[in-house]
């Protein structure tokens, strides 16, 4: 197993904030159930808690305890993931309010990037995923851009490549099918 990822997963479990590659850009991640870690991540980004955050997992099974899904919705997600598609799904009461922000739904994804999925697997739970940048600035696409913009505020940066041609993930409301970000 990749020692680099093991270190990042341990830092997440200990309440740290890490940067890691996803399909399109580098993401920032932490333990979604650790309020202090999430608040630290939001402070790094200069992002208000009210906006909510994306939760990624290694599989739908890892995300399911925090979601309200019927069988049809579960089957739909199983067919679509892993992929750079984020769905807005009704959140269960097990998901902290600081992850959802002002919303009753939570944004969730099973990424189509092996390092991001492995990081969730090694952390043993879903993790936060938000672009590695200060809000309003361009998202970082490599570890050097992450280090230049956020380096001394992060506990760890995972090495890896993003797809240079990829766009940020599509966002779809699972219930209505409405595309919120193409």
From Swiss-Prot:
Domain YrdC-like, chain residue ranges per copy: 2-182
Keywords recorded for this protein, A-Z: ATP-binding, Cytoplasm, Nucleotide-binding, Nucleotidyltransferase, Transferase, tRNA processing
The reaction(s) this protein catalyses: L-threonine + hydrogencarbonate + ATP = L-threonylcarbamoyladenylate + diphosphate + H2O
UniProt xrefs under Pfam families: Sua5_yciO_yrdC (PF01300)
Lineage: Bacteria, Pseudomonadati, Pseudomonadota, Gammaproteobacteria, Oceanospirillales
GO cellular component assignments: cytoplasm
Name of encoding gene: tsaC
InterPro entries named among the record's database cross-references: DHBP_synth_RibB-like_a/b_dom, Sua5-like_dom, TC-AMP_synthase, TC-AMP_synthase_SUA5
GO biological process, one term: tRNA threonylcarbamoyladenosine modification
Region forming the signal peptide: none
EC number in record: 2.7.7.87
One GO molecular-function entry: double-stranded RNA binding
Record carries keyword tRNA processing: yes
Cited PANTHER family: SUA5, THREONYLCARBAMOYL-AMP SYNTHASE
Cellular localisation: Cytoplasm
Protein name per Swiss-Prot or TrEMBL: Threonylcarbamoyl-AMP synthase
Its biological purpose: Required for the formation of a threonylcarbamoyl group on adenosine at position 37 (t(6)A37) in tRNAs that read codons beginning with adenine. Catalyzes the conversion of L-threonine, HCO(3)(-)/CO(2) and ATP to give threonylcarbamoyl-AMP (TC-AMP) as the acyladenylate intermediate, with the release of diphosphate.
């Amino acid at each position: 197993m990749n020692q680099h990822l093991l270190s990042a997963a341990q830092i997440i479990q200990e309440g740290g904030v890490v940067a890691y590659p996803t399909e399109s850009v580098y993401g920032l991640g932490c333990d979604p159930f650790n309020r202090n870690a999430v608040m630290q991540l939001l402070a790094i980004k200069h992002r208000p808690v009210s906006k909510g955050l994306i939760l990624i997992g290694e599989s739908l099974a890892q995300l399911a305890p925090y979601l309200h899904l019927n069988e049809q919705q579960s089957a739909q997600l199983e067919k679509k993931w892993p992929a750079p598609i984020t769905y807005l799904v009704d959140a269960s009461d097990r998901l902290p309010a600081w992850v959802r922000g002002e919303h009753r739904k939570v944004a969730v994804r099973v990424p189509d990037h092996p390092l991001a999925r492995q990081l969730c697997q090694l952390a043993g739970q879903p993790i936060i995923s938000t672009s590695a940048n200060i809000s309003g600035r361009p998202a970082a696409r490599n570890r050097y851009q992450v280090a230049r913009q956020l380096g001394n505020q992060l506990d760890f940066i995972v090495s890896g490549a993003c797809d240079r041609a990829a766009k940020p993930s599509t966002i779809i409301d699972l219930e209505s099918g409405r595309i919120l970000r193409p």
